[in-house]
């Protein structure tokens, strides 16, 4: 619905019923089921223990993850290893085909850290962040990472880490 609204300047008709909601936008009709019940207070599930914070260009981070992910296939799965230093994030991926390495500049505060992620989940979160820069908040090598806008609270994406083997 949001994508249709972005491309439309016409009126939107909204028709709620007991179990469904209907949106009419230009020549499109979208019908959705309404959910009912108690939902998890997601804010209480978000990690609050932040030991490391990385502020980085969203586009640069996406491109770097894509580059090191070139060796990953459905058959050759391997995590993207992120080594967060003083002012750089080094990304690695090692498969039986070889090793890919990239390094990007970032604004980093807190502890240095090494953590691994599934490349697809990491890319999904970064691509959904429609801001020029993101803040990555990390609590440790086995704690979830929060992806937030540089300023404000327009979104919060949680990316779970992958346990890394010791070799690098």
Question: Where do the PLM segments sit?
Answer:
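DNA polymerase processivity clamps
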Residues: 1-35, 50-168
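Specificity-determining recognition surfaces
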Residues: 41-42
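Short hinge/gating elements
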Residues: 45-49
């Amino acid at each position: 619905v949001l994508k249709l609204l972005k491309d439309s300047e016409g009126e939107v008709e909204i028709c709620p019923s007991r179990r469904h909601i209907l949106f009419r936008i230009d020549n499109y009709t979208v019908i959705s089921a309404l959910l009912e019940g108690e939902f998890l207070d997601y804010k209480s599930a978000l990690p609050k223990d932040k030991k490391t914070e990385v502020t980085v260009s969203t586009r640069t981070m996406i491109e770097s993850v894509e580059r090191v992910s070139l060796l990953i296939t459905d058959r050759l799965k391997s995590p993207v290893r992120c080594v967060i230093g003083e002012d750089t994030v080094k990304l690695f991926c090692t498969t039986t085909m070889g090793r890919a390495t990239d390094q990007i500049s970032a604004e980093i505060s807190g502890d240095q850290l090494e953590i691994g992620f599934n490349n697809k989940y990491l890319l999904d979160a970064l691509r959904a962040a429609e801001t020029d820069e993101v803040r990555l908040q990390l609590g440790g090598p086995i704690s979830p990472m929060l992806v937030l806008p540089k300023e404000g609270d327009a979104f919060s994406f949680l990316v779970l880490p992958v346990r890394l083997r010791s070799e690098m």
